[in-house]
Amino acid sequence: MQAQALDNVSKAAFSRREPRAVRTTLKVFPRKNWLDECMTELSPKTMHKRDLGCSGLYRISKVLITSASLEIKLANVINTLPALLPMRRGAIVVVGAEGEPETTATFGVEPPSSGARHIAAKAAIDRIVAKGAPLVVPDTCKSELFQDELQSIVSGTGQVTFIGVPMKADQETLGTLWIDRAKDGAATRTQFEEEVRFLSMVANLAARAVRLNGHESRDSRPIGEEGDRKISGGDKELPEPTRQRPTRIDWIVGESPALRQVVESVKVVAQTNSAVLLRGESGTGKEFFAKAIHELSPRRKKPFVKLNCAALSAGVLESELFGHEKGAFTGAISQRAGRFELADGGTLLLDEIGEISPAFQAKLLRVLQEGELERVGGTKTLKVDVRLICATNKDLETAVAEGEFRADLYYRINVVPLFLPPLRERNGDIPRLAKVFLDRFNRENNRNLEFTPAALEILSRCKFPGNVRELENCVRRTATLARSATIVPSDFSCQNDQCFSSMLGKTADRPLGSHSLNGLAMSKRLPVESPASLGYPAGPGGLTVAPHLSDRELLISAMEKAGWVQAKAARILGLTPRQVGYALRRHHIQVKKI
């Protein structure tokens, strides 16, 4: 074929070396070919610099970074283009779960008929998706690609020019952006080149938004299923299966009983507006489960907004959550909506909720109780409707007892607690997760690596104190350093005494039950009293090993030895007093008073 696909437009558009201009190339075709062929596939070549690229991309970017739903973003993109290009009609078409193009947002055209998935020019759209290359048809009347839709495309306006570009993310074509307009005999090749370049960059920005919203064609439902109707569909109802609520959490991998129990709880909890408190060690996937609750809830069409409370100071946190007025403080050059406003009607995830200061806890409590707030520096009261999900790996009960966390706020956020199991309590899921992470690495790096059964067995025996996050890092590190297409046991750092995490894992080498002694991250402490004084042999790292005892029995033994003083029992077990207190509550052990 004479031309090459315009694959790298998105990358070039945001090149650090050329921030204000995009250099692309177009293979020069003889003039007779341009007019006679009716269809021309374009490839990169140096194009003319024009303000259209800078100002236009800025406007499109502003549309895509809003907190609106994906359908609304795409609709706003297609409706912004007429102010930038001399277009008559246009549409964004995304490849659905079954591989069929589905019109998602339109401008200037009637919605597809009942049961139809596209507006017009299906053959042209199929060509763009299949080849991943732009398509320019100067006169649709002369192209066999448009014969079936010729009447609807021309519709009394005379000759029509068609321009379509692929929507690409990570070298995968996720859909098509196309426009058409009345043919302009004065249009030059340079003008076509500039418009193709600009549309390609817009399409790739839109594709990135599709990818980030989890609507890839290979593992998600069609975009139209996100709402009760398509953007361009007016009051036309979608087929019955589209209106059904999703019931699967496809991105949570695992079949262990501990995980499935949490998943089933998520499905039940998601149908309500109750506050949820996700608890578990770092790396257990609290954000994934929060997203699952949102996607399975009636609020799934509204925004899902998240904020890590531990990363911000109290002053900044207040501004981030509540917003601020112009001039409220130094640097507040404009009014800004807070996360509560952005999440209105949807779901707000507050990660590391246990790290917020007592002073700010009172302000947060008022918002949760009254459903209203004022921006920093403002006096106007704003009403918000937000479903709150909080996450923490902190022992909030001990924090309440010690006065570090308000009891009334604790009761407000702890309506439905969900405890996420650490990876070592579901090690049967490790091979599945490892394969998923390796497949992702292969796609990103164009590799074809695979594990041997022995390698998967090695992974299954690891403790992974960092849980799923650490497992992913382990897989990526091993895959990066692998010297052959097959990963064998000797490729793992832990087999060569080069893995620090394997040393941390030795501190958790005794048997652990569900939500056991380390409900939070296990960490080795220097014991004041010898673990052997409990009557058990010392295990790796100097910690006690009692294979015949359950965690509950081991905890009771330590407490009895310590005279039911939690701090002393913590030193015996190599834990913190907070972890011991957490374990006592999890195992429903009543502390005896001596």
UniProtKB/Swiss-Prot annotation:
It comes from Sinorhizobium fredii (strain NBRC 101917 / NGR234). Residues 252-480 form the Sigma-54 factor interaction domain. A divalent metal cation binds at C494, C499. SUPFAM superfamilies: GAF domain-like, P-loop containing nucleoside triphosphate hydrolases. This is Nif-specific regulatory protein. Keywords: Activator, ATP-binding, DNA-binding, Metal-binding, Nitrogen fixation, Nucleotide-binding, Plasmid, Transcription, Transcription regulation, Two-component regulatory system. ATP binds at residues 280-287, 343-352. GO terms for molecular function: ATP binding; ATP hydrolysis activity; DNA-binding transcription factor activity; metal ion binding; sequence-specific DNA binding.
